[in-house]
């Protein structure tokens, strides 16, 4: 929070597959005092809501480059995915961007650019690594699991 307002896409929780633990990242857009609250729940807990487990006050006195993380869908956390690059959730129109993520256990991983499916390439379980040319609207990473015919959304990037 900044001035008691939640920062949209200002944090990213992803599973560090090398260290076998969750990693929490924070992206601030302004200098000043920020309140970081971590919410959690146990995997075997049937409750739908998480509860606050720790709170940090962070005083940001220098801003190098403001950013937002991409929008993360629930399947990203359920499947313990991880983003290496790009961490910035807002991509520049027309730029060529490397995509590097860990997507464990998927049978297929693909992307849409401007709502158009790309050729499926660059995924060998658990690594997705490829380059894309950013279009004029959203980029979404999808994964298929087991014998299911539908894709689940994992990560959504916006375009400026």
Identify what each model region corresponds to.
Residues 1-160:
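Mixed-charge, low-complexity segments
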């Amino acid at each position: 929070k900044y001035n008691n307002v939640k920062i949209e896409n200002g944090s990213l929780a992803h599973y560090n597959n090398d260290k076998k633990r969750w990693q929490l990242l924070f992206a601030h857009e302004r200098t000043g005092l920020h309140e970081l609250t971590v919410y959690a729940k146990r995997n075997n807990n049937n409750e739908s809501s998480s509860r606050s487990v720790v709170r940090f006050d962070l005083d940001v006195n220098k801003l190098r480059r403001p950013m937002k993380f991409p929008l993360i869908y629930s399947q990203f956390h359920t499947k313990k995915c991880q983003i290496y690059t790009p961490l910035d959730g807002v991509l520049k129109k027309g730029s060529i961007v490397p995509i590097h993520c860990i997507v464990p256990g998927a049978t297929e991983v693909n992307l849409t650019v401007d709502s158009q499916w790309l050729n499926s390439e660059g995924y060998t379980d658990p690594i997705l690594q490829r380059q894309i040319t950013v279009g004029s609207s959203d980029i979404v990473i999808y994964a298929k699991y087991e014998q299911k015919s539908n894709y689940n959304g994992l990560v959504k990037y916006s375009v400026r």
